[in-house]
């Protein structure tokens, strides 16, 4: 079994030194990491091939797991983009002088040691390492067993870049024991880990929430909806739904449910469902949908709360916008929701009343992404309200402290 106490101690010690690095020093290391990824591409791809050869890898994980030369190049580009982003560490959010003459400033600081728990996504290894390093945080990575060889190769490359730049390589560490027992112990490493960020399925996230004693930032399972209002441009709605469902069905910002106002359902659903089927999507529908398109798969109650991560969508006809909002707030995961409408008031009501991190008018749910929001690479998409919500970039990986300058004041 991996010595988690030792990993934690090493990460904590590394975090102390990271906090002292200048922005220029951090950017130099990140640039070295980008160069190392491309120069070690063959080793990374060979390790990834070992993971892909495992017959136990679920089919729906293969796209997430697969690395190619282009994807490694994208990782390197992502690292360089993090270099170009402003460093939040040391920024002063607010400063003022109090009545006693003390100068008080609220200053951005690293969180410390961040624990990442994720599944078959090797890109998370690089994204998380880059964002944590830029913000002066050490990171301990615990990926899924499906991606173990890929993660080991990537971490070896990143740690090599740290060593080459004379930075403590324990700023980035990987837990190679993928057993549930070790994961459970990691979730309770409160002496060393300041926050856990799980990325993966709803089951993984719920397991972390149930077992962790380390504080958790809950990231998104994505049971995302598109509601087509009675005042929608229907071709626009079709384009948005197809993009949200088909472009990358395995990701958390993919569209999983389609709600349609009853006034346009009869005219619109046949063409919408045909367009989905042409893209290989299995369509499940409620009774009203079945009445319009009889050969859809009947939807069950379980469908409304399910994140498929696959080419499957469930369709429901609703009587009003209010009914759509009620349904969404009951079944969603507070990730990303969209309305298609030309009615300004309807759109704004939807944005006001839907409980989600990201609420769209006339746009695909697929835009919930750190790069698309201009944050650079994201470490995850938070679906909770405390500390961070939505795509988590650099700023969300910081805390703050108050620094107070005086000249001998005592309190009376």
Swiss-Prot record:
Its EC number is 1.2.1.41. It catalyses: L-glutamate 5-semialdehyde + phosphate + NADP(+) = L-glutamyl 5-phosphate + NADPH + H(+). GO terms for cellular component: cytoplasm. Its main location: cytoplasm. It comes from the Bacteria. Pfam families: Aldedh. Pathway: Amino-acid biosynthesis; L-proline biosynthesis; L-glutamate 5-semialdehyde from L-glutamate: step 2/2. It is found in: Cytoplasm. Keywords: Amino-acid biosynthesis, Cytoplasm, NADP, Oxidoreductase, Proline biosynthesis. One of its GO terms (biological process) is L-proline biosynthetic process. InterPro entries: Ald_DH/histidinol_DH, Ald_DH_C, Ald_DH_N, Aldehyde_DH_dom, G-glutamylP_reductase_CS, Glu-5-SA_DH, GPR_dom. GO terms for molecular function: glutamate-5-semialdehyde dehydrogenase activity; NADP binding. Catalyzes the NADPH-dependent reduction of L-glutamate 5-phosphate into L-glutamate 5-semialdehyde and phosphate. The product spontaneously undergoes cyclization to form 1-pyrroline-5-carboxylate. NCBIfam families: PRK00197.1 (NF001221), proA (TIGR00407). Belongs to the gamma-glutamyl phosphate reductase family. This is Gamma-glutamyl phosphate reductase. It comes from Lactiplantibacillus plantarum (strain ATCC BAA-793 / NCIMB 8826 / WCFS1) (Lactobacillus plantarum). The gene is proA.
């Amino acid at each position: 079994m991996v010595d988690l106490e030792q990993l934690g101690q090493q990460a904590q010690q590394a975090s102390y030194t990271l906090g002292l690095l200048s922005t220029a020093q951090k950017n130099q290391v990140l640039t070295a990491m980008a160069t190392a990824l491309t120069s070690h591409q063959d080793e990374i791809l060979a390790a990834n091939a070992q993971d892909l050869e495992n017959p136990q890898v679920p089919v729906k994980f293969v796209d997430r797991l697969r690395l190619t030369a282009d994807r490694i190049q994208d990782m390197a580009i992502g690292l360089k983009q993090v270099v170009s982003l402003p460093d939040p560490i040391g920024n002063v959010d607010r400063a003022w002088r109090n009545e006693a003459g003390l100068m008080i400033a609220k200053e951005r600081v690293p969180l410390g040691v961040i624990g990442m728990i994720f599944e078959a996504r090797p890109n998370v290894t690089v994204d998380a390492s880059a964002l944590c390093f830029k913000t002066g945080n050490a990171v301990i990575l615990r990926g899924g067993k499906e991606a173990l060889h890929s993660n080991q190769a990537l971490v070896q490359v990143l740690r090599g870049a740290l060593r080459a730049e004379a930075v403590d390589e324990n700023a980035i560490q990987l837990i190679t024991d993928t057993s549930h027992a070790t994961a459970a112990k990691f979730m309770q490493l409160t002496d060393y880990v300041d926050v856990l960020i799980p990325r993966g399925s709803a089951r993984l996230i719920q397991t972390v929430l149930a077992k962790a004693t380390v504080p958790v930032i809950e990231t998104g399972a994505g049971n995302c909806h598109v509601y087509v209002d009675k005042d929608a441009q229907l071709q626009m709605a079709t384009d948005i739904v197809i993009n949200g469902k088909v472009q990358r069905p395995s990701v958390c910002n993919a569209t999983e449910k389609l709600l349609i106002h009853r006034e346009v359902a009869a005219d619109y659903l046949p063409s919408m469902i045909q367009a989905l089927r042409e893209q290989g999507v299995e369509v499940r529908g409620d009774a009203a949908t079945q009445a319009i398109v009889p050969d859809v798969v009947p939807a069950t109650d379980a469908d409304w709360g399910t994140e498929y991560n696959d080419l499957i969508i469930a369709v429901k006809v609703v009587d009003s916008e209010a009914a759509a909002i009620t349904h969404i707030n009951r079944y969603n995961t507070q990730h990303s929701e969209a309305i298609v409408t030309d009615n300004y008031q309807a759109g704004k009501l939807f944005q006001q009343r839907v409980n989600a991190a990201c609420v769209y008018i006339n746009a695909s749910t697929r835009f919930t992404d750190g790069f698309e929001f201009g944050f650079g690479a994201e470490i995850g998409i938070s679906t909770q309200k405390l500390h961070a919500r939505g795509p988590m970039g650099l700023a969300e990986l910081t805390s703050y402290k108050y620094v107070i300058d005086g000249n001998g004041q005592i309190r009376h």
